[in-house]
Amino acid sequence: MFLDLVQRRNPDLIRAAVALHQRGIIPANTYVIDLDTIMENARAITATSKETGVQTYFMSKHFNRNPIVSAAIVQAGFPGIVAVDVQCAKAQWRYGNPVQHVGHLVQIPKHEIPHVLEMRPEVWTIFSLENAKLLSDAAEAMGMVQDILLRVRAPE
């Protein structure tokens, strides 16, 4: 399905990847990314978000947390990334990419909270009152206030 879309929209990318692989320049299981197209799409999304007043973030897990791709998307106008787990936050932060939203899929472990707070995310998703208390205590100890998003689920 995904490859069909790439074949229609960007056949040159596929041709280049095949040629590079067949010449032994890139090995199998290598990500081949069209950074120009990614930046073009990021600029279009950013322009629309500004027109509509909707805040946007991007998930670097979709391209294996590649810090070069993340930096290009930020350069194109996105404010920062959604870190779906602490490893993602650390990987992006290490390369200077802004981490704007944490805890989206996996809660940040309690002993990692102070380090992630140092990243100054705009928002932090919380799944439970216990995690809210852990975050609040850590933020207060650091003299900070952290905005949160609550993950709400229907009763099971």
Roles of regions detected by a PLM:
Residues 32-35, 39, 67, 129:
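Non-membrane alpha-helical structural segments and their capping/turn regions in soluble enzymes
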Residues 1-27:
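Alpha/beta catalytic barrel-like cores
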